[in-house]
Amino acid sequence: MATVIAKVKVMPTSPEVDKESLKATLKELVENNDAKCRGVSDEPLAFGLYTVFVMVEMEEKEGGMDPIEEAMNALENVESAEVVELSLV
């Protein structure tokens, strides 16, 4: 099977959400879903808001990134999470 690399864009609910805590939570979530976190970064958006990007590496399987994406969307301080890039290695 091939290895999948995905870039997930995560939007926090507000500028008051602690950036470092959110990044740590996202990394832990990825690793608890049989995947590897290859990096977490943030970029300023506007008016104090920021976007968090999570690079995920996992083995190709049925359902793919859906369980991880759904778990990220279920987090309390996350407004939305979506896969913005996906490639096979």
Swiss-Prot record:
Signal peptide: none
UniProt cross-references to SUPFAM superfamilies, sorted A to Z: eEF-1beta-like (SSF54984)
SMART domains, per database record: EF1_GNE
One Pfam family hit: EF1_GNE
Cross-referenced InterPro entries: eEF-1beta-like_sf, EF1B_bsu/dsu_GNE, Transl_elong_EF1B/ribsomal_bS6, Transl_elong_EF1B_B_arc
Function: Promotes the exchange of GDP for GTP in EF-1-alpha/GDP, thus allowing the regeneration of EF-1-alpha/GTP that could then be used to form the ternary complex EF-1-alpha/GTP/AAtRNA.
Name by which UniProt lists this protein: Elongation factor 1-beta
Classification lineage: Archaea, Methanobacteriati, Methanobacteriota, Methanomada group, Methanococci
PANTHER family linked: ELONGATION FACTOR 1-BETA
Family statement: Belongs to the EF-1-beta/EF-1-delta family.
